[in-house]
């Protein structure tokens, strides 16, 4: 590596300008790219938990249940491990990653520490994976269950430190909007769920012969994760993403305090074990949330459909329809317990999964270095397969577990395979989206020699190799690049023609044009 004194004169002068706080045209793209990389890690680990420990294990469990024609046909420990991977491994990873990426931007302050963000990802991913492994028979589960619970709590603590204590010293305003209050309540619900999960883990490790949580603590953990964490945060993020991309009218902000307080009351009821009262309150909150978000009201603007499946707003409304159905089934399950499984599936797959399948392909590629969704057709196929599979699953599970229809046991496995196909298409679509290089959302002709060299290599790291091959040898000998050094100055430092470098870069960016621009 070169020292400052051995750098070309143009580089030394640019570093001197930087030290004197000379202005640099354009925002610094490097922090954005690094934050997107952290988000990509959360998304990829979430997709892995969705496809393998989550859905695949769930299909296996359902096949066992259908074969024995009883809900007790599959291992309860395996079912609990599957549920944990789905709720915390998939949805939890998505929510934590998106929160660490988007909330600092909303506040206008960068993430306090990217390193702590990566530590959060490592602790969370390891904790969820260890918990799943213990449930399916991993050796040493008596140590693994409590240890995994501690890792998950540590990850949550780190994430909240990063989110609620930003690096900016500017005075913070008290959050009053609907999205913020629901987010605060939702993370409170996650904390409650993880604390109960830790209690169950320690009790199971100390007293049980198998890695199976006591039924009451397991139900409390799941209900807290669902009603206290996933649903409030889904509503909170709907105020931003669903409203904008589906073209809805602005949310009714006057519902913020009541809905936030209602979620906290619901969490308190669940912690007290008052499940029937909690179900009644949950049904009321569902109605209030749908009213506040204006989900079923006519859109005020055209939906933003470019690059995605054009009917995705209909599936967002379908998701909220499933939410209402799930809340009704939860209430009914207090009188007919056999409906409990169908109710939970309507909420987790019907609402949560459908909402993510509908809005995720619209927002995640944009967050991940402004990529394009790989395929709108794969998005459409995953949504339709999920919709049909979920309908078949909820109907057949309610009928089969109630003992009302023998045919339902044959439909159950088929519904599972439909949902598995939907999940695999969704995972493949997002994975292929991530595998694509970020496109250049500008005309190559607009780039020239006066653009900072730092912008090129920070926004599109592969241009570093291109520029080195084109003769900018200093880039090969130093890692740091002065932010005010223009491409023309870098060319002069090497005795190169700046127009030749610009031509090479324009060829590079022509090959990176978005598909819709090339069509």
What kind of region is each of these model predictions?
Residues 1-2, 519:
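Initiator methionine at the very start of the polypeptide chain
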């Amino acid at each position: 590596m070169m020292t400052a004194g051995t750098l070309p004169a143009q580089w030394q002068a640019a570093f001197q300008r930087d030290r004197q706080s000379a202005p640099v045209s354009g925002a610094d793209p490097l922090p954005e790219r690094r934050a997107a990389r952290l988000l990509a890690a959360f998304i990829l680990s979430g997709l892995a938990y969705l496809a393998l420990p989550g859905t695949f294990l769930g299909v296996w469990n359902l096949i066992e249940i259908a074969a024995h024609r009883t809900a007790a046909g599959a291992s309860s420990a395996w079912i609990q491990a599957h549920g944990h991977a789905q709720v915390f491994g998939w949805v939890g990873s998505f929510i934590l990653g998106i929160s660490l990426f988007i909330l600092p931007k909303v506040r206008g302050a960068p993430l306090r520490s990217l390193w702590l963000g990566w530590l959060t990802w490592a602790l969370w991913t390891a904790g969820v994976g260890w918990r799943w492994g213990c449930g399916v028979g991993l050796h040493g589960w008596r140590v693994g269950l409590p240890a995994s619970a501690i890792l998950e709590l540590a990850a949550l603590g780190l994430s909240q430190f990063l989110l609620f204590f930003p690096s900016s010293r500017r005075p913070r305003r008290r959050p009053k909007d609907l999205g913020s209050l629901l987010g605060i309540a939702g993370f409170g619900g996650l904390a409650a769920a993880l604390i109960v999960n830790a209690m169950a883990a320690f009790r199971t490790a100390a007293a049980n012969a198998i890695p199976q949580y006591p039924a009451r603590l397991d139900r409390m953990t799941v209900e807290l994760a669902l009603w206290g964490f996933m649903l409030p945060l889904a509503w909170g993020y709907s105020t931003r993403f669903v409203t904008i991309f589906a073209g809805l009218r602005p949310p009714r902000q006057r519902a913020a305090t009541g809905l936030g307080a209602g979620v906290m009351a619901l969490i308190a009821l669940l912690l007290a074990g008052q499940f029937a009262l909690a179900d009644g309150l949950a049904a009321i909150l569902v109605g209030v949330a749908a009213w506040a978000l204006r989900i079923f009201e006519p859109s005020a603007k055209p939906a933003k459909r470019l690059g995605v499946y054009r009917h995705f707003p209909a599936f967002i409304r379908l998701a909220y329809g499933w939410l209402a159905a799930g809340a009704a089934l939860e209430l009914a399950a207090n009188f007919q317990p056999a409906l409990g499984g169908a109710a939970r599936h309507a909420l987790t797959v019907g609402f949560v999964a459908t909402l993510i399948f509908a809005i995720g392909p619209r927002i995640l590629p944009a967050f991940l270095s402004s990529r394009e969704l790989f395929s709108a057709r794969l998005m459409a196929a995953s949504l339709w397969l999920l919709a049909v599979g979920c309908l078949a699953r909820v109907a057949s599970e309610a009928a089969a577990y109630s003992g009302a229809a023998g045919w339902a046991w044959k439909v159950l496995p088929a519904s599972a395979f439909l949902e598995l196909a939907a999940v695999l298409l969704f995972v493949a679509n997002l994975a292929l989206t991530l595998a694509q290089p970020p496109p250049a959302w500008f005309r190559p002709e607009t780039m020239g020699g006066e653009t900072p060299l730092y912008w090129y290599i920070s926004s599109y790291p592969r241009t570093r190799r291109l520029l080195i091959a084109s003769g900018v040898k200093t880039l090969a000998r130093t890692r740091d690049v002065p932010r005010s050094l223009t491409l023309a100055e870098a060319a002069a430092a090497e005795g190169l023609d700046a127009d030749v470098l610009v031509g090479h870069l324009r060829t590079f960016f022509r090959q990176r044009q978005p598909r819709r621009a090339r069509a």
